[in-house]
C-alpha cells in the first residue's frame, strides 16, 4: 500500500524538477513619435478651448502618459480647471474629461 502512493509522488517530484522557468515578462513601452505627440497636444488644446469657451493660448497641457493601448494628456485652463484628453493607440482623439 505504501509503495502505491510512493511511486506517483516520486514521479511528480521528478517532473516538477524538469520544468523550465517561465520567462520574465516586461511591460511594453512604445516610443511616441514627437510629431504625433505635438499633433495630439494641438488637438487636445483645441478641444479644451472649445469645451471651456476660451482661446487655445490659455490652455496648458502638463502631462502625457501611455496606458494599455491608449494615451492621456492632462492639462488645465487659465482658471485652473483641470481636464484629461484621451486618445486611442493610433493617436485619434477619443474624448475630453473635465476634472
UniProtKB/Swiss-Prot annotation:
Gene Ontology cellular-component annotations: plasma membrane
Matches recorded under Pfam families: YsaB
Transmembrane portions of the chain: none
Lipid attachment residues per UniProt (S-diacylglycerol cysteine): 18
Subcellular location: Cell membrane
Signal peptide coordinates: 1-17
Lipidated positions per record (N-palmitoyl cysteine): 18
Keyword Lipid biosynthesis: no
Gene behind this protein: ysaB
Predominant location category: membrane
Name of the protein this chain belongs to: Uncharacterized lipoprotein YsaB
Organism: Shigella flexneri
Cystine connections: none
Keywords: Cell membrane, Lipoprotein, Membrane, Palmitate, Signal
Membrane topology value: Lipid-anchor
Domain of life of the source: Bacteria
